[in-house]
Amino acid sequence: EFINDEMIIITEKEGKLSLVNLRNNTVSEINHSIPVTSYGQGGLLDIVHYNDYLYISFTIGNNQGKYTTAIGKGEFLYPYNEIKKFQTLLEALPYLNSGAHFGSRVLINRGNIYATIGERGNGELSQNPANHIGSVVEINLNGTKTTPRFSNYKDSLPEVFQIGLRNPQGLALSINENMYLSNHGAKGGDFIGLVLPNTNYGWNNIGWGGKNYIGTQIGTGKAFSDEYLKPILSWVPSIAPSDIVFYQGNEFPEWSNDLLITSLKFKMLLKISISDGNVSNETIILKDKIGRIRDVDVNSKGEIFLISDESNSTIWKITNPKRK
């Protein structure tokens, strides 16, 4: 996450927060009191800098040995060496034993926090807005609840914005303020889709073209159904999409408003164009160069930064040689 064009904050699964100074290539640790637990696929997850605060998704445990995804915030002021007054705003319910599918990405839009919550390997829960499993949640910046979106469901939680997801690891805002997410299917069925209130992507009644890892059908066996919101793009076989971001900047002006997508499985960065809900120009930008790609971000100049998901993770920058 960029603080400015010279400074990036990086989260590490085990709980470390680092500030990278791109001007002098130094790394310093940020002190914090986030009650993070590294468990399974969980740990310190996403981070967003907004109006002198950091908004963070992380894994938290309870004294029964169960875990969940949580959202919190804290003050972050110059000289950027400490998070102060940290508070947890939301704990996804219920806590579960599973160490899988925590999500999670965070986005600030129209004065609200949006965060993706994975279904933790308990897909049947993602059809019920009375819990947070397999959903997008929406809360105010101070953690209070917003307008209920699933009021037609008994006991629905007011912060549940969208349901029926498996493991959403990307969340991005377009130039016209539409929100999009990336979601991991099982054996096939990864997708990009709109984030819309009171909608349901169908997991695990449908599998978006994928199957269970043992080869059996998912739910009804249908790839899609008119009962559920349909993705704008899906992949069979899976590409394992993680972070996504809409491109803006002068470095690659021809890519303006295109969506950049990282792929863990195929170790690539690709881009797509979206117009009126239709996808075109799916193009691979980078493949098999830096390993599994976990994160992508763009600075104000339009330079693209990537973080690899390897034992020795590295930061990479993509610039346009035609502009040098």
Per-segment meaning from a language model:
Residues 293-295:
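Repeated scaffold domains used in trafficking and secretory/extracellular systems
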Residues 1-123, 170-185, 237-275, 299-320:
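Acidic, Gly/Ser/Thr-rich repeat motifs that build Ca2+-stabilized beta-propeller blades
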Residues 30, 89, 161, 285-286:
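Hydrophobic residues at beta-strand termini and immediately following loops
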Residues 2, 163, 287, 298:
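Conserved strand-loop elements at the edges of beta-sheets that form or border functional pockets
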Residues 42-44, 119-283, 291, 301, ...:
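Beta-propeller domain segments
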